[in-house]
């Protein structure tokens, strides 16, 4: 048992270093190509001329697509091995290391050039790769899946400052191949990864800063649960839109470089309307939570960002949809809150409350993981008093979503890739 805890600690440190490496690589690329040192792609887009804002995501997509296409052509005769941590957990716990690193580099290119895709996919993949590399050299084969799971949970904890949610991510989404008794090492890896991340960055323990002083009574809990119903319908619709968009890109029969370039070009076009479509949506989520905009502003940015996310994910841009889903959920919740604000007092507070609820419930509706989604929002914001209401709303959203559409976003992602 002590041996396992020691290995879990080592994997937590390795995962945090892998995530930190990806973050620093992003900052370097943003400085080299965008002259941006703020860490916000939205700020970078705002400071660019319109023509550069238009073509930068397309150039990044073209470069990433060429990298993936070239690697595929050079390795056509090699036997297939997993390049995704979910696939590795469902098989024999082994990765194609070269292909996985190329995929991560391609993700770095599209993310740093402004595509509306999450960087967490590559971060978690690199964390799982680091864990797998260590495990194959230092542990017996029958434990490899456990250590990959520890690496994935640690990567998520490091990326989102949410160790418990990272552990439950494994338990609720990926645990089909593991015993519940293995959750101990997973939690240790996640917590150690978060502590290492804090030591490396010295940043805020919370991912998002929220000022919410609204007292929770029957009315507020009713609004939270009703937001879960809204998200339970919107989640399957969002997944259907992603599938339909992806199939539309495939029907164009473009080579990967041009397919990803087209997705990036669409993001560039949308960024001419609002630079907020660039990136994974983190900075826009933070600004919305600090100062909720008017309903018309939220609606405009929401529509543009949704189209950008669909273009990026549909074109096959390597990355995650976790953070974009949080932004879309926030927007849905805030729109719902703003509409109720016409009749109820405390419009801004209600918008923030239902925005946070929208983040949790849309995540639950798309992942079918209500406990993970609830804990994630609480850990990212520190608003643990929302936990009871969020948990009920997330369960409602997850059950309704599963009734309308059996597949989660992760099963859908595995099937498409």
Curated annotation (Swiss-Prot):
One of its GO terms (molecular function) is voltage-gated chloride channel activity. The chain crosses the membrane at residues 5-25, 54-74, 146-166, 168-188, 190-210, 222-242, 258-278, 288-308, 316-336, 339-359, 380-400. The keyword Kinase does not apply. It is found in: Cell inner membrane. It holds the Pfam family Voltage_CLC. Gene3D superfamilies: Clc chloride channel (1.10.3080.10). Disulfide bonds: none annotated. InterPro entries: Cl-channel_core (IPR014743), Cl-channel_volt-gated_ClcB (IPR023790), ClC (IPR001807), ClC-type_chloride_channel (IPR050368). It is a multi-pass membrane protein. Its main location: membrane. CDD domains: Voltage_gated_ClC (cd00400). One of its GO terms (cellular component) is chloride channel complex. Probably acts as an electrical shunt for an outwardly-directed proton pump that is linked to amino acid decarboxylation, as part of the extreme acid resistance (XAR) response. Belongs to the chloride channel (TC 2.A.49) family. ClcB subfamily. This is Voltage-gated ClC-type chloride channel ClcB. It comes from Citrobacter koseri (strain ATCC BAA-895 / CDC 4225-83 / SGSC4696).
């Amino acid at each position: 048992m002590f041996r396992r805890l020691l290995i879990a600690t080592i994997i937590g440190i390795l995962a945090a270093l892998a995530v930190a490496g990806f973050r620093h690589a992003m900052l370097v690329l943003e400085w080299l190509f965008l002259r941006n040192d703020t860490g916000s792609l939205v700020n970078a887009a705002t400071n660019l001329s319109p023509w550069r804002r238009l073509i930068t995501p397309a150039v990044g997509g073209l470069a990433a697509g060429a990298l993936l296409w070239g690697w595929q052509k050079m390795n056509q005769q090699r036997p297939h091995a997993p390049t995704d941590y979910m696939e590795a957990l469902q098989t024999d716990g082994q990765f194609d290391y070269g292909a996985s690193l190329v995929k991560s580099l391609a993700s770095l290119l599209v993310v740093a050039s402004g595509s509306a895709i999450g960087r967490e996919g590559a971060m978690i993949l690199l964390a799982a790769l680091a864990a797998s590399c260590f495990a194959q050299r230092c542990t017996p084969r029958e434990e490899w899946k456990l250590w990959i799971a520890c690496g994935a949970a640690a990567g998520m904890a490091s990326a989102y400052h949410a160790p418990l949610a990272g552990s439950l991510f494994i338990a609720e989404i990926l645990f089909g191949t593991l015993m519940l008794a293995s959750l101990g090492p997973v939690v240790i890896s996640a917590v150690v990864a978060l502590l290492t991340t804090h030591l490396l960055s010295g940043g805020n323990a919370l991912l998002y800063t929220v000022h919410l002083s609204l007292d929770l009574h029957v009315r507020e809990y009713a609004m939270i649960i009703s937001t879960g119903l809204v998200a339970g319908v919107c989640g399957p619709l969002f997944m259907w839109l992603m599938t339909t968009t992806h199939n539309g890109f495939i029907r164009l029969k473009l080579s990967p470089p041009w397919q990803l370039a087209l997705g990036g070009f669409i993001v560039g076009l949308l960024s001419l309307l609002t630079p907020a479509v660039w990136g994974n949506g983190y900075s826009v989520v933070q600004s919305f939570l600090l100062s909720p905009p008017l309903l018309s502003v939220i609606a405009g940015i929401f529509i543009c960002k949704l189209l950008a996310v669909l273009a990026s994910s549909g074109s096959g841009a390597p990355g995650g949809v976790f953070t974009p889903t949080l932004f879309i959920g926030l927007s849905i919740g805030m729109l719902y809150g703003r509409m109720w604000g016409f009749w109820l007092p405390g419009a801004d507070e209600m918008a923030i409350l239902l925005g946070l609820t929208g983040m949790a419930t849309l995540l639950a509706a798309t992942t079918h993981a209500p406990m993970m989604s609830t804990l994630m929002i609480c850990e990212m914001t520190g608003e643990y008093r929302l936990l009871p209401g969020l948990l009920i709303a997330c369960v409602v959203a997850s059950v309704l979503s599963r009734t309308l559409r059996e597949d989660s976003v992760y099963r859908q992602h595995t099937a498409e890739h």
